[in-house]
Amino acid sequence: MAELKSFTLADLSQHTTKDSLYLAIHGKVYDCTGFIDEHPGGEEVLIDEAGRDATESFEDVGHSDEARDIMSKLLVGEFKTDSSEKPKAKSPSSSTPRPIPAAEPSDSGSLQYVLALAVVAGCVIWKVLL
């Protein structure tokens, strides 16, 4: 087997489109360009992680042995980290959970008051009639 090419984060950052999409996973670099349309999770997932170390995202989802076999065919190199390079910050995506805004106060307090008053009135009437 031919020696694998070494890729830095700067090298990976040049491959972030559908026409050229590379991912680093567990220290290996994969050319996923030809696999984009076949990816079961959809192309958006791959494009969101393109050009960076996607190890954490890859493991968070979990992948089958078959997926790992496919990866071996996409292997193009090794990922070399340089201490002077900072990992690219993950951009917010549509799959990123958003915080749920706090509920706004409503007039349900007055409804609760009316219901409580109706229950008390019902109890008083029931006691008087029995």
From Swiss-Prot:
InterPro entries named among the record's database cross-references: Cyt_B5-like_heme/steroid-bd (IPR001199), Cyt_B5-like_heme/steroid_sf (IPR036400), Cyt_B5_heme-BS (IPR018506), Cytochrome_b5 (IPR050668)
Lineage: superkingdom: Eukaryota
Membrane spanning stretches: 107-124
Domain Cytochrome b5 heme-binding: 4-80
Cellular component, GO annotation: endoplasmic reticulum membrane
Topology versus the membrane: Single-pass membrane protein
UniProt-annotated stretches for the region Disordered: 80-107
Keywords recorded for this protein, A-Z: Electron transport, Endoplasmic reticulum, Heme, Iron, Membrane, Metal-binding, Microsome, Transmembrane, Transmembrane helix, Transport
GO biological process assignments: sterol biosynthetic process
Molecular function in Gene Ontology: heme binding; metal ion binding
Pfam families tied to this protein: Cyt-b5
Subcellular location: Endoplasmic reticulum membrane; Microsome membrane
Residues that coordinate or bind heme: H39, H63
Function noted in UniProt: Membrane bound hemoprotein which function as an electron carrier for several membrane bound oxygenases.
PANTHER family: CYTOCHROME B5 (PTHR19359:SF150)
Family recorded in the similarity comment: Belongs to the cytochrome b5 family.
Stated name of the protein: Cytochrome b5
Species annotation: Mortierella alpina (Oleaginous fungus)
